Each structure stands twice: as C-alpha cells, then as structure tokens.
Amino acid sequence: MYKRLFISHVILIFALILVISTPNVLAESQPDPKPDELHKSSKFTGLMENMKVLYDDNHVSAINVKSIDQFLYFDLIYSIKDTKLGNYDNVRVEFKNKDLADKYKDKYVDVFGANYYYQCYFSKKTNDINSHQTDKRKTCMYGGVTEHNGNQLDKYRSITVRVFEDGKNLLSFDVQTNKKKVTAQELDYLTRHYLVKNKKLYEFNNSPYETGYIKFIENENSFWYDMMPAPGDKFDQSKYLMMYNDNKMVDSKDVKIEVYLTTKKK
C-alpha cells in the first residue's frame, strides 16, 4: 500500500513539473485589474509618440523563416528584411527562457510583433554580416513567434474586439488572422493599430484616455495588458515590450477581445 502511495506521489510530482516547465504558453487566468493597478496617462510626462510608434504601420512580419544565429541562450536571430523603410535585415527575438528559444530553434516559423531599436544588442557574429552598417541594420522584439507548419488557416478568421469607454460598449470591430494558434502580441498589435488610427489612442504628446487595458478571454481564462506607459518623463520601449516575452498564445477560434478605456475628466 505504501509503495503504491509513494509511486502515486512520484507520478504526481513529475506531472506538475511537466506542466510548469512546458514551453507552450497558452492563456492563463488573471484577475481583472483594479483601478489603482492601471497606469494613468496623466502621470506620464514624456512623449506618447514613443508608445505610438510601436503600434503604427511599421512592425516585424515574416512567414516561414528559420533562425540563423543565437546571441544568448534565450533568444533567436532571424534574417528578416524591413521591406517598407529598409531599417533592418536581421531581427533578434528574445524569449522569457531557454525552453521557449529551444522550442523554435531550427524550425520554420512565422514572426509578427512590435519592435524596438534603442538598447537592441546582437552578437558580433551577426553584426559582421552587415559589416559597416551594423547599427542601422538590426532590430529587436520579444516573442511573436508561431510554428508555420500545421498552423495555417485556409482563409482569414475574424475576431471581434469590443471597446468599452467609461463602462459603455461604444465600438466593436474585427481583427483578422490566418493562424490557428496566434500570439496575444499579434492580436494586441492589430487592436491598438486600429485604435490609434480611428480613436487616437496615442497622440504625439499624450492620450485622450486616462487608463486603458486590453483583455483576452479564452473559455474560462483571461489575461490583460496595460495600454498606458508607466509614470515618469521617459518611456522605455524595450522594458514595455518585455510583457510579450512569454510568447503567450490563444486559439483564434475561441478567443474574445475586450478593451476598457476611461476618458480624462475635463
């Protein structure tokens, strides 16, 4: 009897370890934020333009690519060219841990996400690829990677975004993806891109909204990202985008998206 009990405990421990260590990060439950948990745009005195550019027309996007190098054990480097502005031809993708990097190393993947340049570091080996233009030919991002094979839809799938302004559902619109499993980062980018264009979510100096967060709901689980910068006079793009480093994914057929905004009091 004791032997069977011991074996059962061992099996349970290994099962828990497997769950904790698995690199496939899907939606996990997170309580809705309390008002005092959210950043307030009125407390940010820097340029909101530095947030806006993360969700404007320029982002990293590549289909069916494979990593060419690795700087640190938790990142991968891809040969991806900026076809719009010509600002980079190599992209460093940083993950939360080694397991995630190993999961996608040497596999064909799709990459989509917001990128930054300041404090973007590459290995000397990758820098040498670009010789004298090293500082101008690279960019960095966090997560945003999905396996290419077996993850494509025959046609784009629409996901409805419901926008609540001061508690009222004043707007709904669709974002689209052709992926079965899609990163929250990709859907977040598409949502904010729409709101920047149509609701002036971020302007040059500030925002017409005091607080905002985007919420992803999948079955009974939900999680959210704060849409405003932290208090202060400077905005660190790298630090802000780090929230995507777990490469969190959702199922495009099940996920629901809600945005909660509060306007500034006049």
Curated annotation (Swiss-Prot):
The keyword Metal-binding applies. Disulfide bonds join 120-140. GO terms for cellular component: extracellular region. Residues 1-27 form the signal peptide. Keywords: Disulfide bond, Enterotoxin, Metal-binding, Secreted, Signal, Superantigen, Toxin, Virulence. Its main location: secreted. InterPro entries: Enterotoxin, Staph/Strept_toxin_CS, Staph_tox_OB, SuperAg_toxin_C, Superantigen_bac, Toxin_b-grasp_Staph/Strep, Toxin_bac. GO terms for molecular function: metal ion binding; toxin activity. It comes from the Bacteria. It is found in: Secreted. Interacts with MHC class II molecules composed of alpha/HLA-DRA and beta/HLA-DRB1 chains. Interacts with T-cell receptor beta variable 19/TRBV19. Staphylococcal enterotoxin that activates the host immune system by binding as unprocessed molecules to major histocompatibility (MHC) complex class II and T-cell receptor (TCR) molecules. In turn, this ternary complex activates a large number of T-lymphocytes initiating a systemic release of pro-inflammatory cytokines. Also causes the intoxication staphylococcal food poisoning syndrome. Lacks the zinc-binding site found in other members of this family, such as staphylococcal enterotoxin A, C2 and D, thus it possesses only one MHC class II binding site. Belongs to the staphylococcal/streptococcal toxin family. This is Enterotoxin type B.
